[in-house]
Amino acid sequence: MLITGESGAGKTENTKKVITYFAILGAVESKKKDGDPPEEKKANLEDRIVNTNPILESYGNAKTIRNDNSSRFGKFIRIYFNQMGKLAGGFIDVYLLEKSRVTYQQPNERGYHIFFQLVEEGPVPGLQEMIRMSTDPYDYFFMSQGKVKVDSIDDQEELEFTDQAFDTLGFSETEKFDAFKTTALIMHLGEMTFKQKGREESCEMDDPLPGQKSCELCGIENWQLFYGNFIRPKIKVGTEWVYKGQNADNCLNAIAALARSMYNRLFMWLVDLCNRTLIDPTMKKVNFIGVLDIAGFEIFEFNTFEQICINFCNEKLQQFFNHHMFVLEQEEYVREGIEWEMVDFGMDLEATIQLMEKPMGLLAILEEETLFPKSTDKSFEDKLKENLLGKSPVFLKKQPGSKDKSAHFAIAHYAGIVNYNLSDWLTKNIDRLNDTVVDQLKKADNALVVYLFRDHPGQPEEEAKKEKGKKGKDAGAKQFKTVSSAFRAQLESLLATLNATDPHFIRCLVPNNHKTPGLLDSALVMHQLTCNGVLEGIRICRRGFPNRTVYLEFKHRFVIIKPKEVHACGTDLKAATKVILESIEDANDRWRLGH
């Protein structure tokens, strides 16, 4: 099941209902076929599948302008069944968590729900003392740039649900509290400040307390060195290692990059632990029902890196949908013996997909510029226009009338032309971490923090011992993994799975932007029907023969057109239908007769 739609259209709620239904159905089948024994175990598996939602929502959902509980990531959930139809487990894949929301929120938006749950006192005794956080969200910069309270959300109650979900899923006390402590650590990192010295590339710590709290939570004794590693990281110049002074802005940028990376790694760790609890090794997995919950096509006033990833994903999904319709149409026409020149509708979107995927396409250029140390937004823009403008029919100059006056280019997608702004794409595609700080974190006493950064190479000289005996090429290949390359690999894996299944498409629509029941904004709905591919599907159907009627029904309905001729056909329904259709002028190319 592919569930798509705009933010606030109901994707997450529909996904939860679908998952709950299949989980309960699988448990009922277990009880029917097994009788009384191990009912408790199977009910627990059902509960675990359902209870992944509070954790994923706490760490992956946030308030946006349009939706108080918006999923800021995509997910593909598999519900497994054995040969008897019994529930046999589950597995969750996640896509493209919005890391930038960790450190920045627009006005009237909010950070991830878990941040605001942790400042609530009561549901988890002693939590504030353990994580060293106050109960005032305004004490923390990373969570107070937008709104801090949402009328429709009771953060205290939600913390209780999150805590219970950890227990239901079988997280140990250590795992649960390590997750809370690491989340709090990220908030404390946001409070670290620096004072600029007289010289341009030099600064010093301002208030030592946030750094001390951060070090306490991650198990680092030398908090002065922790600050010092931001202020004067070790870098390689030629063949020599030197300490390079940083100005205050550089230090703050390094902290923000560390916070985003740490939160993303924490989120992926939580998903891995959820998957661990959903596996029942005693059950043989034969079939699965997959539910894909992912953002639909987005055309905003300001479109940036997140939108290009989401829209590329939707181009691929729409191509899959179009090709699927083509295959179904072809099968139907072959079954009915209808002669028709077949067109693979999936090829209609090929120009845009080629723009993204070809060897010197947009994604390849983004990868190249991301990994080149001296690249800038301007050099990236210049290279895109040099290689794509005028050479691809769908890569365009920014379109007039855009409210984003700083847009750099436009792409003609199936849902419409979208203007894109290139600002910060290189930064968003890879968070360049301060390797000196990461090396210190990898030696911390907090086992979870060490685990989260286990695959980060750190300083090359620190890794030299581990990499001894390996070829330099192999050792260096793992240094950087960009968001776009990881997302592209995930997307290819997802499409391979979808191509091996029998897909069903669910399109969710926002009826109006006022959250008012019973009100339908026709212009808004039409825009969404365009963006989620419904109109594209109608266009495809109209290129074939979209209306299918059985002969008996057609004869009874239209006999009035040629009553004598139809009655002369007797019981031959196909002949009667042909008589009626041939009497209509200039319509012979618009109908066919099946078996």
Segments from the language model and where they lie:
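Active-site-adjacent structural elements in folded domains
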Residues: 145-152, 276-279, 285
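A generic structural motif
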Residues: 8-9, 170-172, 297-304
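Short amphipathic alpha-helical interface segments
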Residues: 174-182, 284-288, 594
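Alpha-helix N-cap/helix-initiation sites
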Residues: 12, 70, 173-177, 280-281
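Extended, low-complexity interaction tracts enriched in P/G/S/Q
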Residues: 1, 24, 29-106, 111-120, ...
